[in-house]
Amino acid sequence: IISPPVCGNELLEVGEECDCGTPENCQNXCCDAATCKLKSGSQCGHXDCCEQCKFTKSGTECRASMSECDPAEHCTGQSXXCXXDVFHKNGQPCLDNYGYCYNGNCPIMYHAQCYALFGADVYEAEDSCFKDNQKGNYYGYCRKENXXXXXCXXXDVKCGRLYCKDNSPKQNNPCKMFYSNDDEHKGNVLPGTKCE
């Protein structure tokens, strides 16, 4: 059962141009609370590209860039809504060729992924640590297939479990790994990482 639209419930429903609540409570200068239609001369009532009841000027940024792979979006000047969030194509080089774009991010090995798991003084381990990913067991693998660990090919050893070097005085662990019983993928190299 679909209930009919109700003007004044602060929900934008079919047939309404705006809905700012009851006439007593409406705080939107662009909207006629009694009819849920825009007032005369108003182009819009709300949204990221609506300012003082008019569409925001074309080219005005409405969504900031979150990374090199996620460009900022801008108002079109023809709509109250911000343009759809788009990313650079997956596989496009980023961060001076250290990584590839993947779903709007630029995941790289180096310090960032180890830091996120373990904190300061932890860096990407030596290449020799990653060779364990060829074993295809609980400690080293590339991916899971039917709950079984599948080994990495020699060329892909840096695409599986993430090995970090802990330089802190108490640890001094050259091949540190992260284990999680809640998330079996946590502790793996992030998807999309340039793992050469």
Curated annotation (Swiss-Prot):
<keyword id="KW-0645">Protease</keyword>
<dbReference type="GO" id="GO:0006935">
    <property type="term" value="P:chemotaxis"/>
</dbReference>
<feature type="disulfide bond" description="In disintegrin-like alternagin-C">
    <location>
        <begin position="164"/>
        <end position="175"/>
    </location>
</feature>
<keyword id="KW-0482">Metalloprotease</keyword>
<feature type="disulfide bond" description="In zinc metalloproteinase-disintegrin-like alternagin; alternate">
    <location>
        <begin position="129"/>
        <end position="175"/>
    </location>
</feature>
<feature type="disulfide bond" description="In disintegrin-like alternagin-C; alternate">
    <location>
        <begin position="18"/>
        <end position="36"/>
    </location>
</feature>
<dbReference type="Pfam" id="PF08516">
    <property type="entry name" value="ADAM_CR"/>
</dbReference>
<feature type="disulfide bond" description="In disintegrin-like alternagin-C; alternate">
    <location>
        <begin position="114"/>
        <end position="129"/>
    </location>
</feature>
<comment type="similarity">
    <text>Belongs to the venom metalloproteinase (M12B) family. P-III subfamily. P-IIIb sub-subfamily.</text>
</comment>
<feature type="disulfide bond" description="In zinc metalloproteinase-disintegrin-like alternagin; alternate">
    <location>
        <begin position="18"/>
        <end position="31"/>
    </location>
</feature>
<feature type="disulfide bond" description="In zinc metalloproteinase-disintegrin-like alternagin; alternate">
    <location>
        <begin position="94"/>
        <end position="106"/>
    </location>
</feature>
<feature type="disulfide bond" description="In both disintegrin-like alternagin-C and zinc metalloproteinase-disintegrin-like alternagin">
    <location>
        <begin position="62"/>
        <end position="82"/>
    </location>
</feature>
<keyword id="KW-0800">Toxin</keyword>
<feature type="disulfide bond" description="In zinc metalloproteinase-disintegrin-like alternagin">
    <location>
        <begin position="44"/>
        <end position="50"/>
    </location>
</feature>
<keyword id="KW-0106">Calcium</keyword>
<dbReference type="GO" id="GO:0005576">
    <property type="term" value="C:extracellular region"/>
</dbReference>
<dbReference type="GO" id="GO:0005886">
    <property type="term" value="C:plasma membrane"/>
</dbReference>
<comment type="function">
    <text>Disintegrin alternagin-C: potent inhibitor of the collagen binding to alpha-2/beta-1 (ITGA2/ITGB1) integrin. Has a chemotactic activity on neutrophils and this effect involves actin cytoskeleton rearrangement, FAK, PI3-kinase and Erk-2 activities. Induces endothelial cell proliferation, and these effects are mediated at least in part by an increased expression of vascular endothelial growth factor (VEGF). In injured muscles, reduces both MMP-2 mRNA and gelatinolytic activity, suggesting that it changes the overall balance of extracellular matrix protein turnover during muscle regeneration.</text>
</comment>
<feature type="binding site">
    <location>
        <position position="6"/>
    </location>
    <ligand>
        <name>Ca(2+) 1</name>
    </ligand>
</feature>
<feature type="disulfide bond" description="In disintegrin-like alternagin-C">
    <location>
        <begin position="101"/>
        <end position="106"/>
    </location>
</feature>
<keyword id="KW-0217">Developmental protein</keyword>
<protein>
    <recommendedName>
        <fullName>Zinc metalloproteinase-disintegrin-like alternagin</fullName>
        <ecNumber>3.4.24.-</ecNumber>
    </recommendedName>
</protein>
<keyword id="KW-0964">Secreted</keyword>
<keyword id="KW-1200">Hemorrhagic toxin</keyword>
<feature type="binding site">
    <location>
        <position position="9"/>
    </location>
    <ligand>
        <name>Ca(2+) 1</name>
    </ligand>
</feature>
<keyword id="KW-0479">Metal-binding</keyword>
<dbReference type="GO" id="GO:0090729">
    <property type="term" value="F:toxin activity"/>
</dbReference>
<dbReference type="Pfam" id="PF00200">
    <property type="entry name" value="Disintegrin"/>
</dbReference>
<keyword id="KW-1217">Cell adhesion impairing toxin</keyword>
<feature type="disulfide bond" description="In disintegrin-like alternagin-C; alternate">
    <location>
        <begin position="69"/>
        <end position="94"/>
    </location>
</feature>
<comment type="subunit">
    <text>Monomer.</text>
</comment>
<feature type="binding site">
    <location>
        <position position="73"/>
    </location>
    <ligand>
        <name>Ca(2+) 2</name>
    </ligand>
</feature>
<feature type="binding site">
    <location>
        <position position="11"/>
    </location>
    <ligand>
        <name>Ca(2+) 1</name>
    </ligand>
</feature>
<dbReference type="GO" id="GO:0030154">
    <property type="term" value="P:cell differentiation"/>
</dbReference>
<dbReference type="GO" id="GO:0046872">
    <property type="term" value="F:metal ion binding"/>
</dbReference>
<feature type="binding site">
    <location>
        <position position="71"/>
    </location>
    <ligand>
        <name>Ca(2+) 2</name>
    </ligand>
</feature>
<keyword id="KW-1199">Hemostasis impairing toxin</keyword>
<feature type="disulfide bond" description="In zinc metalloproteinase-disintegrin-like alternagin; alternate">
    <location>
        <begin position="7"/>
        <end position="36"/>
    </location>
</feature>
<feature type="disulfide bond" description="In disintegrin-like alternagin-C; alternate">
    <location>
        <begin position="152"/>
        <end position="159"/>
    </location>
</feature>
<feature type="disulfide bond" description="In zinc metalloproteinase-disintegrin-like alternagin; alternate">
    <location>
        <begin position="114"/>
        <end position="164"/>
    </location>
</feature>
<dbReference type="InterPro" id="IPR001762">
    <property type="entry name" value="Disintegrin_dom"/>
</dbReference>
<feature type="domain" description="Disintegrin">
    <location>
        <begin position="4"/>
        <end position="90"/>
    </location>
</feature>
